């Protein structure tokens, strides 16, 4: 839809304050999209008071001033949904950056626009309905091979009244061609639009019972997230938020990944664009970009568009969820989104809340995270959206408003620790501060699909790490050698849990992804060391001899053992540990 076709009425600018513009003479409604100034800068109505309309503009506003026109479209901010979104990169209002770069180079002109999906590409449509079939909102009417990994399901729009199919075609079509006609006169295309601030409807929201397997041992082993769950990754500068997010985007067992770079550095998005096409999806072996949509709203792009990029991403995620896919959405970082809200709020001269953030910060965060979940769709399928948001508290202070409000909402908390990062322990997730409220509902899945004693093994590791934390304070006062021998041995076992199990190299070809079976196997090797060491200690063997066996250090190399060899390697190490320790008594 071009700007000219969309205009319903025109007003004029009254004042400009950064990204906030006030206009008069507009017959607008809240959240209407408007085009501001002679260049037609895209904006959104955020406040109406009498004849004065307040607009947040999604582009740099320098050069526009009072008296210039404001054109109202009469429509809310919407995204284009259809085949072609995967393997694409958008800005915060779903303008395709790769398409615009081809037209005008690395630096985009203001006021440019392009459809979110290519209207000229031909797609091979394969119908799944026949003339005479009854269809309703959300039903699948056909499929398109969108990428080598994903079959795109063409859906009856959610607002449709449905009806009987009177005509259906198979063959090659563009997204705007009619592929199905109903007896009501409604024509269904492969392309539909949806307002970003409105949640797409579903039949029911269900309790998630299956984990989103991340391939990160500390997450899958200690703090799992469910498919349809919510998680926050807060941490100070340099603690590994972005690397953790990227590892999840690369290796989580979701069908679709939506990665939102919200206010972060441009080179981080560049890294994603360079890495993802080269890396294989661990589930299918196809390129990762074949299941990924990127939304880039970096720190040097307009502040107001950060506010919309989060909603754009979650709406795209909901569309693929409606097809029955499991979607993982990474938002890096929600703090920059909150800062954008703070700036807009201050320009509007609203009453500030804590640290200058708007009073509605908690409500906006809740609206976003509550669109995650495990859902039953209208077409009988089940799909999920898992939302993982990075939080960037200034100075790593978890008591600031964005972290605290996020904590009240999410059910998984992965706290990154600068002390661990400085010790080069990555992922730098603090096991004392982190938690997952999904553990109990996910344990049956791990028991059925991985191993019977998954929960018991995890609890054993947690107990050892808790005991180590208590002993650390004593060690700092009197030294390790002053402890009883059994406590010295506990510290040694805890060291292996930290170094061999919790640490993981995101840059190593093998260690960057660890399947749950291998996660369990490595921990079982450490537990064997624990049990056999205490038996040797009970038999009178000095702790120095127990800790000097040469089989134990092999545990540290299990992470880099190829996945198809780890079972034999763990069994061999267990046998060596047992033999060497029993030789001592």
Swiss-Prot record:
It is found in: Cell membrane. GO terms for cellular component: plasma membrane; proton-transporting two-sector ATPase complex, catalytic domain. This is A-type ATP synthase subunit A. It comes from Halobacterium salinarum (strain ATCC 700922 / JCM 11081 / NRC-1). CDD domains: ATP-synt_V_A-type_alpha_C, ATP-synt_V_A-type_alpha_N, V_A-ATPase_A. PANTHER family: H(+)-TRANSPORTING TWO-SECTOR ATPASE (PTHR43607:SF1), V-TYPE PROTON ATPASE CATALYTIC SUBUNIT A (PTHR43607). ATP binds at residues 235-242. Its EC number is 7.1.2.2. Keywords: ATP synthesis, ATP-binding, Cell membrane, Hydrogen ion transport, Ion transport, Membrane, Nucleotide-binding, Translocase, Transport. Its main location: membrane. It catalyses: ATP + H2O + 4 H(+)(in) = ADP + phosphate + 5 H(+)(out). Has multiple subunits with at least A(3), B(3), C, D, E, F, H, I and proteolipid K(x). InterPro entries: ATP-synt_VA_C (IPR055190), ATP-synth_a_Xtn (IPR031686), ATP_synth_asu-like_sf (IPR023366), ATP_synth_asu_arc (IPR005726), ATPase_a/bsu_AS (IPR020003), ATPase_F1/V1/A1_a/bsu_N (IPR004100), ATPase_F1/V1/A1_a/bsu_N_sf (IPR036121), ATPase_F1/V1/A1_a/bsu_nucl-bd (IPR000194). Belongs to the ATPase alpha/beta chains family. It is a peripheral membrane protein. Pfam families: ATP-synt_ab, ATP-synt_ab_N, ATP-synt_ab_Xtn, ATP-synt_VA_C.
């Amino acid at each position: 839809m071009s700007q000219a076709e969309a205009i319903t009425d025109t007003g004029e600018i009254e004042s400009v304050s950064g990204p906030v513009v006030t206009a008069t003479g507009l017959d607008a409604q809240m959240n209407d999209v408007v085009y501001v100034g002679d260049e037609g800068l895209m904006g959104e109505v955020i406040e109406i008071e009498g004849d004065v309309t307040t607009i947040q503009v999604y582009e740099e506003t320098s050069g526009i001033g009072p008296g210039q026109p404001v054109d109202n479209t009469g429509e809310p901010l919407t995204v284009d949904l259809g085949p072609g979104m995967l393997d694409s990169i958008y800005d915060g209002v779903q303008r395709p950056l790769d398409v615009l770069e081809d037209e005008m180079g690395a630096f985009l002109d203001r006021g440019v626009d392009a459809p979110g999906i290519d209207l000229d590409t031909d797609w091979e449509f394969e119908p799944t309905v026949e003339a005479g079939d009854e269809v309703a909102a959300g039903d699948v009417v056909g499929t398109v091979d969108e990428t080598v990994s994903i079959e795109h399901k063409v859906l009856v729009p959610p607002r449709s009244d449905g009806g009987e199919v009177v005509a259906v075609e198979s063959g090659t079509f563009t997204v705007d061609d009619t592929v199905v006609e109903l007896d009501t006169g409604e024509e269904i295309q492969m392309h539909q639009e949806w307002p970003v601030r409105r949640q797409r409807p579903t039949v029911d929201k269900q309790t998630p019972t299956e984990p989103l397997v991340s391939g990160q041992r500390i997450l899958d082993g200690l703090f799992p997230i469910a498919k349809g769950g919510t998680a926050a990754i807060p941490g100070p500068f340099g603690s590994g938020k972005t690397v953790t997010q990227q590892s999840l985007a690369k290796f989580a067992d979701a069908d679709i990944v939506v990665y939102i770079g919200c206010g972060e550095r441009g080179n981080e998005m560049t890294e994603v664009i360079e890495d993802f096409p080269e890396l294989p999806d661990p589930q299918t072996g196809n390129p990762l970009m074949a299941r990924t949509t990127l939304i880039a709203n970096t720190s040097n792009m307009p502040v107001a568009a950060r506010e919309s990029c989060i909603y754009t991403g979650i709406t795209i995620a909901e569309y693929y969820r409606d097809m029955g896919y499991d979607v993982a959405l990474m938002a890096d970082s929600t703090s920059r989104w909150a800062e954008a809200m703070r700036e807009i709020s201050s320009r509007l001269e609203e009453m500030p809340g804590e640290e200058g953030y708007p009073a509605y910060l908690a409500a906006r965060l809740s609206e976003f995270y509550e669109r995650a979940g495990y859902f039953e769709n209208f077409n009988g399928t089940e799909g999920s959206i898992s939302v993982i948001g990075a939080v960037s508290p200034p100075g790593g202070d978890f008591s600031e408003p964005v972290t605290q409000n996020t904590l009240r909402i999410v059910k998984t908390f992965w706290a990154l620790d600068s002390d661990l990062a400085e010790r080069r322990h990555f992922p730098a997730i603090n096991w004392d501060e982190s938690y997952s409220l999904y553990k109990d509902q996910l344990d049956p899945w791990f028991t059925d699909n991985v191993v019977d004693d998954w929960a018991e093994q995890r609890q054993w590791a947690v107990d050892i790490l808790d005991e180590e934390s208590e002993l650390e304070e004593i060690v700092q006062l009197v030294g390790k050698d002053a402890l009883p021998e059994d406590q010295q041995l506990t510290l040694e076992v805890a060291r292996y849990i930290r170094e061999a199990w919790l640490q993981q190299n995101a840059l190593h070809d093998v260690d960057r992804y660890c399947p749950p079976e291998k996660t369990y196997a490595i921990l079982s090797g450490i537990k064997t060391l624990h049990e056999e060491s205490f038996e040797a200690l009970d038999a009178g063997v000095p702790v120095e001899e127990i800790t000097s066996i040469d089989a134990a250090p092999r545990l540290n190399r299990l992470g880099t053992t190829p996945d198809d060899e780890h079972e034999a390697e763990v069994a061999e190490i267990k046998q060596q540990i047992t033999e060497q320790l029993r030789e001592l008594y």
